[in-house]
Amino acid sequence: MNNKISVYDKDNFFELYQKLRANPISLNEIIEKPTMLSLLPNLKGKKLLDLGCGTGGHLQLYLERGAAKVIGTDLSEKMLEQAEKDLQKCGQFSGRFSLYHLPIEKLAELPESHFDVITSSFAFHYIENFPTLLSTIHDKLSSNGTLIFSQEHPITTCHKEGERWEKNDKKQQVAYRLNHYREEGKRNRNWFKQPFQTYHRTTATIINNLIHARFQIEQMEEPMLADQPQWHNEFKDLSHRPPLLFIKARKVEK
């Protein structure tokens, strides 16, 4: 039984989140999704797991790219209900997906395994024990399986106090303030007036955790829209710092 409750299942929060995600000009649509898809291998006939799958948007894209079967896990019941509805609308996906109400921290309890690819978007900075999670992911992957994930960049997760931005007389962002970077651990935050916790790890810690869990890092990305000038006015803050860190790593056997 899962005793943990998702913030997305609280009154009105899911509706607010849905409105945010419906915006075609968002960090998810302009940065996260294109970068994640660019890191994927050929999915034809593959079995995938998406940790923290939300409403199943990535699962649908994986199926459209030829995945044989996709599994999604999430802590939020409302997210999974929406994912079920959206995936069922596409008749060709019938029998090719499964959804589990399961927090990422309890991945070991998932009855499925031998995944060719495991992905996760915007989720790992919520995990307290990252080494344990990586060990479980390693066990769930097939030989030479691939892990691809995005999380808030450590430059962002390190923040503890004060204003995040240095601004000029016109209130324009001119520099991002970096503080408490070396101080790893829990951060208390607030979004849509809902308190929640994230966990800060330095980039070095993330990389070393992956190496110690027997992963070979194949690619890292810190997208900042350098090649997409049409979005520079909408996302001016990206000229100062990358909001997300992406890592693609391959399972290495003992």
From Swiss-Prot:
Domain of life: Bacteria
Protein name: Uncharacterized protein HI_0912
GO molecular function: methyltransferase activity; S-adenosylmethionine-dependent methyltransferase activity
PANTHER family: TRANS-ACONITATE 2-METHYLTRANSFERASE, TRANS-ACONITATE 2-METHYLTRANSFERASE-RELATED
